[in-house]
């Protein structure tokens, strides 16, 4: 018997930094519903999905990211997360790159991207250790305002433009929210 799929997860609740030391100043991320985030990603000209090793803590997320990759979104697999894609036999549009070099490249508007086709307009983050993701998002917030920073992570990320509220303690709601993002991308 299949588990009941939740719909209409309110990802706008609990918009406080997951770690209280991560207060960036007057400009903090806004929380959005999954369908809005999905629509933004769908309309992006050059989206990039950046994933990290925390996906191994929740392996079903690899399958969800592969689903996004099959929609034509290139995947930057940081740390050793590339192994999750290799193990599933999916390497199309998957690029292995360190988080810090990627952050450095993304700072520059004239960077040609992982595929040589140009800079990205929307960068989507998830599965990266909270402190690393916060640093990456902060760098982009302060050094390249042309990129829309979107987090579909289980944590509220203060330096993103768009994020979920904290869903870290409710994996079912988090999975449902990501499923809603993917469904909105298909419309």
From Swiss-Prot:
Q: Which InterPro entries match?
A: CdhB, DHS-like_NAD/FAD-binding_dom
HAMAP family, alphabetically? CdhB (MF_01134)
Return one Gene Ontology term, BP aspect.
Answer: methanogenesis, from acetate
Q: What is this protein called?
A: Acetyl-CoA decarbonylase/synthase complex subunit epsilon
Q: Which Pfam families match?
A: CO_dh
Q: Identify the SUPFAM superfamilies for this entry.
A: DHS-like NAD/FAD-binding domain (SSF52467)
Family annotation (NCBIfam families): cdhB
Q: Give the highest taxon in the source lineage.
A: Archaea
Q: Which residues fall in a coiled-coil region?
A: none
Taxonomic placement: Archaea, Methanobacteriati, Methanobacteriota, Stenosarchaea group, Methanomicrobia
Please list the residues that carry the modification Blocked amino end (Met): 1
Assembly description: Heterotetramer of two alpha and two epsilon subunits. The ACDS complex is made up of alpha, epsilon, beta, gamma and delta subunits with a probable stoichiometry of (alpha(2)epsilon(2))(4)-beta(8)-(gamma(1)delta(1))(8).
Q: Family, per the entry?
A: Belongs to the CdhB family.
Q: What does this protein do?
A: Part of a complex that catalyzes the reversible cleavage of acetyl-CoA, allowing autotrophic growth from CO(2). The alpha-epsilon subcomponent functions as a carbon monoxide dehydrogenase. The precise role of the epsilon subunit is unclear; it may have a stabilizing role within the alpha(2)epsilon(2) component and/or be involved in electron transfer to FAD during a potential FAD-mediated CO oxidation.
